[in-house]
Amino acid sequence: MASTTTRRALLGGAAALGALAAGAGFAAAGRKKGHPVMSTPAITHLPPPRRVERVLRASSEHWVGDGFRVKSVITPTGDPRLQSPFLLLDHAALRRFEPATERRGVGEHPHRGFETVTFAYRGEIEHRDSAGGGGIIGPGDVQWMTAADGVVHEEKHSRRFTEQGGDMEMVQLWVNLPAKQKRSKPGYQALLDASFPRLQLGAAKARLIAGALGRERGPAFTHTPMTVFDLAFTETGDAELELPKGFTALLFTLEGELRSAEQASSLAPGQLATLARGDSTLVRLSGAAGTRALVLAGEPIDEPVVSYGPFVMNTQAEIVEAVRDYQSGKMGHLS
């Protein structure tokens, strides 16, 4: 995300991009219907569960524009050995907004070289971009925007949410693209809550957004192999699941306290655990009723990562090119 003022700073020179360390897009959706819940059998005869390798705590809260008060848990400058292909995770924790006449949010700003994934848990966000994507995401919906060769976009509270006020909670994830796809055509997926398969994993219900879990597959298209889902514990107990061998695996607690097998302490809200890769595919989690978490697993991208504000490429020369392309209007404009 970046403000309109920041856009003018960008036009004035590449150095201003250093202030754009956070940002992405929200986008279209619709309303939801119920979805059947599939049960998966207990996992047996597997190696010991994957252990927690590191626990990361979120940064201090900061405003992105005037509409999103977020904490960053991982950033593009983090260790790719722990987080690749994931670049950034921002959590806008539950916050009440009073009714207003002026829409809050973030003005137009660019991206190149990666994807932004926005999970709307509460509230409504309106998005539009220079590639033609746009619309509203509401509670339970997900937007998957592929910036790739470059887009300019904005995201603001929807008009209805602005006028009525209400609670808002969002997560925004940045996903890296391999070098061969960083200059591909931008894309946009509006994923409705009703499109996500539900699976019962012991004491928790999973909502599958991308990749495979058990016999189910999520509706999101991904450029590299990954599995993305959230968990909600419907009762106090354990949840067992399998993630592909060798994948990066991240656990982020949204609400309550989450515990991984063999972990001495629980993950508090806003904390993220990285799991050791190793040979095991088994992940065993426990939580009390009401605990919510986001689970991210992806095949690492073994390539250099060079980030500069809203651009993530492989070399410094590509960053310079991205800045010039944006300044010259090659990434488009919002009408």
Where is each model-derived feature located?
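Jelly-roll (double-stranded beta-helix
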Residues: 2-335
